[in-house]
A protein has these predicted regions:
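Carbohydrate-active catalytic/glycan-binding domains of CAZyme proteins
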Residues: 1-313
Length: 313
């Protein structure tokens, strides 16, 4: 398992839970042991030392594939640029996707892209993804390669975009593919991190829906081509397929669950690893830095990908 995190002294003007990337291993997918990487504090990927690079302030991993004896890591990073977004002055919010290659999962070499090292640039002024293209997730199908990412448009919320490629290295922006949901819904403020999988003849997108007040749960959308998507109503009271723990419960994932990562099991069921965070009275003032992020696990009800329960419940 590759993940991102940060130490207490990491630049707090970067108001995201990213920083450096690490590796953990497990025999059963339940009990995990962090591995010591070759970089700062045991990381396996860290910000680039060249301040002109797209990934010089922080990095985060969002997808890893094994192909032809190599690990391909699609990651994202932010630069040294400082912006004012809403009530926050933040550094490195101009996220762009990058690629790194490894033989052992510990030692990584960046693949240089055309946009200060990135594979894809942010959109031009006025376009929906002009602020960022973050958390890339890649899928290969009969038509080539698809890269799903999300962005933030302050007046509309979080939006999912798509880029396409013939070789997984050279990418062309396709456009917006998923907008915010209906007013009052669990995804009224948009769709953020996500994973797209092939399931039979369909594409399924498990996405992090954001409410108007910032709470987050997992939703599901379906597509026949990976481009045009239709939301599927979930069984949770808020319309999601897997909801954050009840508000005020004090549980570790009572504020947000997101960044879904699905793994098929031999018995036909699925596991979904996710990042959760707690409620905090300081969130409005401190943003992401007021929250504690951890990794959790949910399991499906057999092959039914619309029914989920937390591991051990």
């Amino acid at each position: 398992m590759w993940y991102y995190g940060r130490d207490p002294d990491f630049d707090r003007q970067i108001n995201l839970p990213t920083g450096r990337c690490g590796l953990a291993t497990s025999r059963d997918g339940i009990a995990w042991q962090a591995q010591t990487g070759p970089l700062t504090m045991g990381a396996v990927l860290e910000p680039h030392p060249d301040e002109k690079r797209f990934d010089s302030s922080h990095v985060g991993v969002s997808d890893v594939h094994e192909r032809d004896g190599l690990y391909w890591m699609w990651y994202f990073g932010g630069s040294q640029i400082t912006q004012t977004i809403g009530p926050y002055t933040v550094r490195g919010f101009d996220l762009r996707p990058g690629l790194a290659i490894s033989r052992d999962g510990l030692h990584w070499s960046r693949v240089e892209g055309p946009y200060r090292g990135a594979l894809l640039d942010v959109g031009a002024p006025g376009e929906f993804d002009m602020l960022m293209c973050g958390w890339p997730q890649v899928l290969q199908d009969a038509t080539g390669w698809k890269m799903y990412y999300h962005t933030l448009e302050p007046r509309r919320g979080f939006l999912v975009g798509l880029a396409v490629s013939e070789d997984g290295l050279n990418w062309t922006r396709h456009g917006l593919v998923l907008e915010p949901g209906a007013a009052g819904g669990f995804d009224e403020q948009g769709a953020a991190t996500r994973q797209v999988i092939r399931h039979g003849s369909d594409y399924l997108m498990f996405y992090e829906g954001v409410t108007k007040s910032g709470y987050r749960s997992i939703g599901l959308a379906r597509s026949t081509d990976g481009v045009h998507w239709v939301r599927e109503p979930g069984r949770e009271p808020d319309g999601s397929i897997f909801a954050h723990a009840p508000r005020g419960s004090g549980r570790w994932d009572a504020f947000a669950i997101g960044t879904p990562s699905l793994v098929p099991m031999d018995d036909g069921s699925w596991r979904m690893y996710y990042i959760g965070s707690n409620e905090s009275n300081q969130h409005a003032a401190g943003g992401e830095m007021a929250l504690r992020h951890r990794i959790g696990l949910a399991v499906s009800d057999g092959p039914d990908l619309t029914r989920w329960r937390r591991w051990g419940e």
